[in-house]
Regions:
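N-terminal pre-ligand scaffold of iron-sulfur
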Residues: 412-497, 514-517, 522-529
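Beta1-alpha1 glycine-rich phosphate/pyrophosphate-binding loop at the start
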Residues: 2-75, 163-184, 378
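FAD-binding core/adjacent interface of flavoenzyme oxidoreductases
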Residues: 2-8, 62-149, 223-225, 236-238, ...
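FAD-site-proximal beta/loop scaffold in flavoenzymes
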Residues: 122-145, 217-223, 228-304, 391-396, ...
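Glycine-rich Rossmann-fold phosphate-binding loop(s) that bind the pyrophosphate
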Residues: 11-14, 37, 130-131, 151-156
Length: 529
């Protein structure tokens, strides 16, 4: 009699949850155990510094509705800490000594905020933003007129500052760099973000460190190394994160700036894999290890690791991607640039509608579109091509991006036409990442299904799930999951076509949930109301 296989995932994160989901989608019928130290089930992190922090999204940004795990026979064990791994016995120790056997082990333990060891660090009112509870605590204090000091001028610091200003707080950013985001974007693009924040009333103190927090029981002031004293009702610290590698290291798994894994996300110990923020993975395109701390990487790397667990995986070579919204400025960034020779701008920089490209040895290593949409796939194609480009042509908005990696002349023009992305759906101004996250935290319609009129359709909330409900002209109710089966965006009702459409990638479904056109391949799940 065959023994049931057990796959254990340590880390109830986005990467861990998507890995568990993928295992079932790929046909794994063994036991799946998903362990999470937090009390919450897996959730999305991007909203924690954006619309959820601002109070614009009340719903918690969970990855899956609560019934998902039981329905898919995934043992989700929250408030459960893994304390040890014994590779020789293939067991994970959890809780007070329980040993859980595994056939494959995936570590998605994520990262934790770096703490500031300065005087006053223990005062109340000093917050680090990483978990859902952190965002809740900060949000409660973002009242009009509150004096908020943000320590750190990276992505988290910049987004928290923007969210606080939109809640009418008085905001000061303190950063070691001369401009925000300088380490990632460089001084030229960082200066643009500095000006964006200043235009919205944020005070930026760059080139200075933190000396101490001051106050009685609560923080009252922040003192910088340059001698400035800043009054504060609330402090948010965002000075980077450190990968959680202690569990792996204690088991002899190689780690350096994360758990070291190959392009198949396999660690130095057979049967143990890693994905998400904690994985320092060899990247075939870049020819080196990279560790990526962004949402899209967790979304895509978790499923890739699941396929490797099933021995059906391929090399993970996705180009890193992230997005950010600050005030009325939205951006998408693709690539991985730790060094570059020049930054080339294309478009209206003063009007904040442009694309920036980071070039090294004439090749594009990263690109960022700011308030310009439908171009990120083209940017990624240029990065992946590894072809040297002409900087003057790159800066010229009249030169199609598709042509930039092609030789001049008729042959290049013909190849450009052949390789141009399809028009239509992608030309409608669609920003996948923003739509994906916004949809996941959106509050569904509160209309009871019994009140739907003939010919009416709505996405409604039913027991924590988002359901696409449509009552046809005969009064028959059709209820299906509102989550697109391609990549998890929410569908919307197309009144003209009487279909459920996904505006992330263009999938379309009949009211019954049957796929009309892809990229989705699976029908929407039927729901009984």
């Amino acid at each position: 009699m065959a023994t049931e296989r057990i796959f254990v995932i340590v880390g109830a994160s986005l990467a861990g949850a998507k890995a568990a989901e993928t295992l079932r989608e790929e046909g794994f019928d063994g036991r799946i155990v998903l362990l999470g130290a937090e009390a919450e089930r897996p959730y999305e992190r991007p909203p924690l510094s954006k619309d959820y922090l601002r109070g614009e999204a009340e719903a918690k940004p969970y990855v899956h509705p609560e019934p998902f795990y039981a329905e898919n026979e995934i043992e989700l064990r929250t408030s459960t800490t893994a304390t040890g791994i014994d590779p020789s016995a293939s067991t994970v120790t959890i809780g007070e000594g329980e040993r859980l056997p595994y056939d494959r082990l995936l570590l998605t333990t994520g990262a934790e905020p770096r703490r500031l060891p300065v005087p006053g660090a223990e005062l109340e009112g000093i917050h680090y933003l990483r978990e859902l509870g952190n965002s809740d605590a900060i949000r409660d204090r973002l009242t009009a007129g509150a004096r908020v000091v943000v320590i750190g001028a990276g992505w988290i610091g910049a987004e928290v500052a923007a969210s606080a200003r939109e809640r009418d707080c008085e905001v000061t950013i303190v950063g070691m760099a001369s401009v925000p985001l300088e380490r990632v974007l460089g001084p030229e693009v960082g200066a643009i973000y500095r000006d964006i924040h200043r235009d919205h009333g944020v005070r930026f103190l760059g080139g200075t460190g933190l000396e101490a927090f001051e106050g009685a029981a609560r923080v009252e002031r922040v003192r910088t190394s340059s001698g400035a004293s800043i009054d504060a009702d609330l402090v948010v610290v965002g000075v980077g994160v450190a990968p959680r590698v202690e569990l792996a290291e204690s088991a002899g798994i190689e780690a350096e700036n994360g758990i070291l894994v190959n392009e198949h996300l396999q660690s130095s110990v057979p049967g143990v894999l890693a994905a998400g923020d904690v994985a320092n993975a060899h990247h075939p395109l870049y020819g080196r290890r990279i560790r990526v701390e962004h949402w899209a990487n967790a979304l895509e790397q978790g499923p890739a690791a699941a396929r490797s667990m099933l021995d059906t995986g391929v090399a993970y070579d996705n180009i890193p991607y992230f997005f950010s919204d600050q005030y009325d400025v939205g951006m998408e960034y693709a690539g991985y640039a730790t060094s570059w020779d020049e930054v080339v701008f294309r478009g209206d920089v003063k009007g904040r509608e442009f694309i920036a490209f980071w070039l090294e040895s004439g090749r594009i290593v990263a690109g960022m579109n700011v308030n310009v949409w439908d171009v990120n796939e083209r940017i990624r194609a240029l990065i992946r091509s590894r072809t040297p480009v002409d900087a003057k042509r790159l800066a010229d908005p009249d030169v199609p991006l598709e042509e930039l990696a092609l030789p001049p002349g008729p042959a290049g023009e013909e190849r450009s036409r052949a390789s141009a992305p399809p028009q239509g759906f992608l030309a409608q101004g669609i920003n996948f990442a923003k739509r994906f996250v916004a949809a996941r935290v959106a509050t569904p319609d509160a209309t009871p299904v019994s009140e739907l009129r003939n010919g009416e359709a709505k996405v409604i909330g039913v027991d924590g799930e988002k359901v696409a409900a449509y009552r046809d002209g005969d009064g028959t109710l059709h209820a299906v999951s509102a989550v697109c089966t391609h990549m998890g965006c929410l569908v919307e009702w197309n009144e003209d076509e009487e279909t459920w459409d996904c505006h992330c990638h263009g999938s379309r479904f009949e009211p019954s949930g049957r796929v009309i056109n892809g990229p989705a391949k699976k029908d929407l799940e039927q729901k009984q109301l």
